[in-house]
Structure formats: structure tokens, C-alpha cells
């Protein structure tokens, strides 16, 4: 797996420490750090509730990421930190572009969360492909039946 991860850190010294913890964790599942968010497969915003307008900065940044990835594959978007912990469900409802929300107490689970998300995404793609193929087969059968019916 040649995946790249970018983490933008807002706020306090603790968040800088947590960002390094996250980088150390995701290395174990094949992610490499990048300084260029546009080449990332995984984009994490590590947030801080103490700083002014932290929540709005998150939504502003997500807007920037959406714009950058409009014509290429969307990265896995994760909101981490204390804003994520406090606003978990609200963030997911307000911004569907967010894939995962993880608070500081769950950083030890971040690899499992990422791998579970990727597995579910793979299954969903496979189901969509199967539905498309089944629909395509049914359309071909219908066309063949209509041709047969005209004789």
C-alpha cells in the first residue's frame, strides 16, 4: 500500500504531540507523511476547541479540500481532536464530505477505524458493480426477449 497522509494541526501543543502520535500509528498500516495535501490519500484535520472559531476553520478547510479534489479521487477525510470529540455527530450531519471523526481518547483505534472504513468502501463498490452488471444483464435479456417476441 503506497498511501500518503497529510495532517493539518490547529491549536495547542498537545495537538502537535497528538499529530505525531497519529503519524506514528498510521505508518504501521502503510501511510507515509506528505507535506502536500493535494497528493494525500488521507487528510486529517487535528482540531483544538480552545482556539477561536475552531469549528468554522474545519469547515473552511474542508471546502478547500473539496475544491482541490473535485477532479480526482477524494481522500479519506478525518476530523480529529477535541472539536471532533465535542461536535462528532453534528459534524457528520453538517458536512457529508467528512468520513470519520475521532476524538483524542480514540487515537489508539485510528488504524482500525481507517481499515474498517476502507473495507466497507470496497464492499460498497463491489455491490454497486454487481448491481450495475445485474442491471446490464437484465437489459440485454429484455432486448433479446423483445427481438424474439417480434418473430
Where are these regions (language model features)?
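Proteins enriched for Cys/Gly/acidic motifs involved in redox and nucleic-acid/cofactor modification
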Residues: 1-151
Amino acid at each position: 500500500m503506497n498511501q500518503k497522509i497529510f495532517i493539518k494541526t490547529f491549536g495547542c501543543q498537545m495537538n502537535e504531540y497528538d499529530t505525531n502520535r497519529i503519524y506514528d500509528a498510521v505508518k504501521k498500516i502503510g501511510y507515509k507523511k506528505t507535506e502536500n495535501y493535494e497528493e494525500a490519500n488521507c487528510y486529517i484535520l487535528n482540531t483544538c476547541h480552545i482556539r477561536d472559531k475552531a469549528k468554522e476553520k474545519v469547515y473552511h478547510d474542508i471546502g478547500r479540500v473539496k475544491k482541490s479534489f473535485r477532479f480526482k479521487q477524494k481522500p479519506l477525510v478525518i476530523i480529529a481532536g477535541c472539536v471532533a470529540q465535542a461536535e462528532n455527530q453534528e459534524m457528520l450531519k453538517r458536512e457529508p464530505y467528512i468520513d470519520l471523526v475521532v476524538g483524542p481518547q480514540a487515537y489508539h483505534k485510528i488504524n482500525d477505524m481507517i481499515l474498517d472504513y476502507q473495507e466497507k468502501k470496497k464492499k460498497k463498490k463491489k455491490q454497486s458493480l454487481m448491481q450495475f452488471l445485474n442491471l446490464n444483464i437484465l437489459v440485454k435479456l429484455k432486448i433479446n426477449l423483445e427481438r424474439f417476441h417480434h418473430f
